[in-house]
Amino acid sequence: MGLDGNNGGGVWLNGGGGEREENEEGSWGRNQEDGSSQFKPMLEGDWFSSNQPHPQDLQMLQNQPDFRYFGGFPFNPNDNLLLQHSIDSSSSCSPSQAFSLDPSQQNQFLSTNNNKGCLLNVPSSANPFDNAFEFGSESGFLNQIHAPISMGFGSLTQLGNRDLSSVPDFLSARSLLAPESNNNNTMLCGGFTAPLELEGFGSPANGGFVGNRAKVLKPLEVLASSGAQPTLFQKRAAMRQSSGSKMGNSESSGMRRFSDDGDMDETGIEVSGLNYESDEINESGKAAESVQIGGGGKGKKKGMPAKNLMAERRRRKKLNDRLYMLRSVVPKISKMDRASILGDAIDYLKELLQRINDLHNELESTPPGSLPPTSSSFHPLTPTPQTLSCRVKEELCPSSLPSPKGQQARVEVRLREGRAVNIHMFCGRRPGLLLATMKALDNLGLDVQQAVISCFNGFALDVFRAEQCQEGQEILPDQIKAVLFDTAGYAGMI
């Protein structure tokens, strides 16, 4: 099997000898040079550039029992057996009898070969796509050849034109023959691929046979009529439009409102158009989106909150603080929620008003002579100036409590490192003794840093550290004792 590209047309032919069949039944791992040599004529320009095939190719085609693929079409309709319609067909598996061939004519040029491989010289047992290139065994495949290739041609002489885009009937089927692909390949019949731009058929920009890009029809964007129901493709197109518009308008639809519970309701987006549940068109007949304020789900947006949101938060915090203060004042609180706190506070105020009214009624019912004196019954919490003066006089007068019996005044003075001293003094308590003692120590030039004073059951003074502040004059312990005894009222006790 090979491609004869020396002449005007390209013909896939099967050799007559058994050696050619043995080569076709070889394994998939055959040398790549053998496989590429068979495809080399396909890449040359003479394979498809000629308008008419060579007469030798037509003679070889008629003599060969096995037909693979014919690259060019002859001008004579009698010689082109692929484009002839059969008058009668007995095949029951063909979907359309109008495009099937007569069984007697099929055996003349399309024979079934199950043992031969496809264009790549692959055995039928190892190539799962072998049936895609066997034209003679499937009558249904002949319909696929007729449908895209011979569809819309007024006469077979139009196939000689290099630019098939000028044929008006061919424009409707051009998108089916050249679908858009990422690898710039176009699927022909039976899974066979050809480059997008072929010599002689024009470039993609010029609207050639194979190189022209498929014009994507957009019937999905147009809504159906009012009486008809939308198709599945129109539904999917509307869903894509609605999803894209939702993403585009997500930033602009930020309207909010506040509820009583502090939740924030955002703008809900609802697309009106095709009703996918009941397969009916909406009454408005518009496929655009409509924004409904106050609907949709609840949520919170990221970013800085609005000013009114911050003010609302401050107001709620202040209200909660006042409620907590009211709850602390009201003695009887049944529950801790806001309604219970306010209800209990109202009940407590009513109870207080009732007690005030009862006291007023009691005062009015009692006679004036039977009232007790106010001086004995009223004891204010804060002392008046008269009571303060009485207390000061009592403090200044000698104490009625005498000193403990058998105890005499005692004063001890000890020197410490440096110029510091320790003083321990105990004597009977009398008014003004503490003030007189501190003045005496100050006159001696001693700075008291740490001291403990007790006036319970006598007067006790413990100075743990007192330093001499005057330089050049050192005070002896005996001098300190004499001054303290004299201050306590025990002169000459040393």
Curated annotation (Swiss-Prot):
Stretches with biased composition (Polar residues): 48-58
InterPro entries given in the database record: bHLH-TF_ACT-like_plant, bHLH_dom, HLH_DNA-bd_sf, TF_AMS/ICE1/BHLH6-like
Processing after translation: Ubiquitinated. Cold-treatment induced association with the E3 ubiquitin ligase HOS1 targets the protein for proteolysis by the ubiquitin-dependent proteasome pathway. Sumoylated at Lys-393 by SIZ1. Sumoylated ICE1 represses HOS1 and MYB15 and facilitates the positive regulation of CBF3/DREB1A-dependent cold signaling and freezing tolerance.
Region ranges (Disordered): 1-58, 240-264, 281-306, 363-384
UniProt-annotated location(s): Nucleus
Annotated GO MF terms: cis-regulatory region sequence-specific DNA binding; core promoter sequence-specific DNA binding; DNA binding; DNA-binding transcription factor activity; protein dimerization activity; transcription cis-regulatory region binding
Pfam families with a match to the protein in the record: bHLH-TF_ACT-like_plant, HLH
Main location: nucleus
Domain of life (superkingdom): Eukaryota
Chain positions of cross-link Glycyl lysine isopeptide (Lys-Gly) (interchain with G-Cter in SUMO): K393
Coiled-coil annotated spans: 344-365
Stimuli inducing this protein: By high-salt stress, cold stress and abscisic acid (ABA) treatment.
PROSITE patterns linked to this entry: BHLH (PS50888)
Biological processes, Gene Ontology terms: abscisic acid-activated signaling pathway; endosperm development; negative regulation of DNA-templated transcription; positive regulation of DNA-templated transcription; regulation of abscisic acid biosynthetic process; response to cold; response to freezing; seed dormancy process
Phenotype upon changing E312G: Loss of excessive stomatal differentiation
GO cellular component assignments: nucleus
Tissues of expression: Widely expressed in the whole plant with high expression in leaves and stem. Broad expression within stomatal cell lineages of leaf epidermis.
Keywords: Activator, Coiled coil, Developmental protein, DNA-binding, Isopeptide bond, Nucleus, Stress response, Transcription, Transcription regulation, Ubl conjugation
Cited SUPFAM superfamilies: HLH, helix-loop-helix DNA-binding domain
PANTHER family: TRANSCRIPTION FACTOR ICE1, TRANSCRIPTION FACTOR SCREAM2-RELATED
Known partners and oligomeric status: Homodimer. Efficient DNA binding requires dimerization with another bHLH protein. Interacts with the C-terminal part of HOS1. Heterodimers with SPCH, MUTE, and FAMA.
Role this protein plays: Transcriptional activator that regulates the cold-induced transcription of CBF/DREB1 genes. Binds specifically to the MYC recognition sites (5'-CANNTG-3') found in the CBF3/DREB1A promoter. Mediates stomatal differentiation in the epidermis probably by controlling successive roles of SPCH, MUTE, and FAMA. Functions as a dimer with SPCH during stomatal initiation.
Protein name: Transcription factor ICE1
Organism this protein belongs to: Arabidopsis thaliana (Mouse-ear cress)
